[in-house]
Amino acid sequence: MMHNRALRSFSKLARHDIRDWVLTGGLAIELRLGVEPASRPLNDIDFIVNAFDCIPRTLAGDLIFRHIHPFDPPGKTLLQSVDPDTALRIDVFRAYGATIRRASPMELPFGRFRVIALEDLVARAARLALDIAVGVPVPSKHARDFLRLVALVDPNQVETAWRDHRKPAHPATFDEANSLLHELIPARPDLLITPEYSKDTEAVCPRCAPTQAMHLADPNAVLGLLEYC
């Protein structure tokens, strides 16, 4: 059974033209793993799109916006919004390479929806977890998700997706990245952290660029809903 909050937010999103959106993030991970999504703590719903123009301006009638980044590159946040009725964050990211084309439809409680491919979820988790290779702390969920997901795939089938997701300094092949992470994750538990989110309502985001139809919410309103902003 899916979280009731998620169902309510998806029902709201269904009022808008989100045909170009692909579900990713924690919900997609649980769906691809064949696990009931309600078993995972739900803090946000993540999507990917190819361009900012894929985000309908009509969302302004149902959501409030914390970050609006029309010019962010692949992998980065285009929109961070909040459903004020469910206090769920709804994030939209710019997709890497051919990620959108590799997505496939799934029948979900809120209707038929495209979900990111398992191979892309593995490649994305590997990209994020590999920060520990250079001594940078990483949210522990990325390492945990990587280990759960990679156990279900043939590493050879991830190579194409890996070329889209890897950073320039990362191993050239997924096989190498996979081996490296299986060494690093158990060796560096000190770098696997639980992140703390900002509560600074005075902070100014240099990447935000509100549009005529989409305006930034009062940070205090976001803080009241999420307990961070």
Model-assigned labels for residue ranges:
Residues 1-229:
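Compositionally biased terminal segments of proteins
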